[in-house]
Amino acid sequence: MEAPNIGIIYASVDGHTKKICEHLQRILSQENMRTTLYSIDNFDAQVSDFHTLIIGASIRYGKHHKKILKFIAQNGTALNHIKTAFFSVNLVARNQDKNSPETNPYLIKFLKQTQWVPNSVEVFAGQLDYKSYSFLDRIMIQFIMKLTHGPTKSETAIDYTDWNKVKNFGLRIKEQLLKS
C-alpha cells in the first residue's frame, strides 16, 4: 500500500515555524510517510491532491499570518474533505498555563475566527531572538515581553520549543492516518 500524500504548509516570519515543519517532515519521513513541505508563499498544489495537510503559522503582534487566514478561507470546503492538522507557534506558549490548544488565547481566537475544525491541533512555544529583529520589532517585542514577564534582554536566541511535543504531534498525526 502506498503511503498517503501529506502536505506541510507554513507561514513563518523569522524562520522558526519552518524549522518546526522541517522537524515534523523528518519525523513523518522516518515513519515512512510521504511528505512535501511548502511555504504558503509558493504552495502551488490543490488541497485535494493530499490525504492530509498540516498547516503551521506563527504569531506576530497577536495575529496569525494573513496568508494562512486567506488560504483557509479560500479552501475551507476542500480542507473539510481531507484530514487536517494545525499548529500555532507563539511566545505566549512558553507559559505553562497557555501552552495547550485549550488554553492558548491566540489559537482559540484563530479557530473561532476561521471556523475551521482541524482533526488535530497543537500549540508550540517559539523562539526569542532579539539580535535577528529589526529595531522596531525588537522594541515592540521587548515591550510585550516586559508586560508578560519575559526576558527583555538576551545576547543569544532562546528556543522555548518543546521538541518532544513536536515529535509527539507528528506521531499523533501518523496514528490518525493509520486509522483512516
Ranges and model annotations:
Residues F43-D49:
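Short amphipathic alpha-helix with an adjacent loop that forms part of the alpha/beta core around
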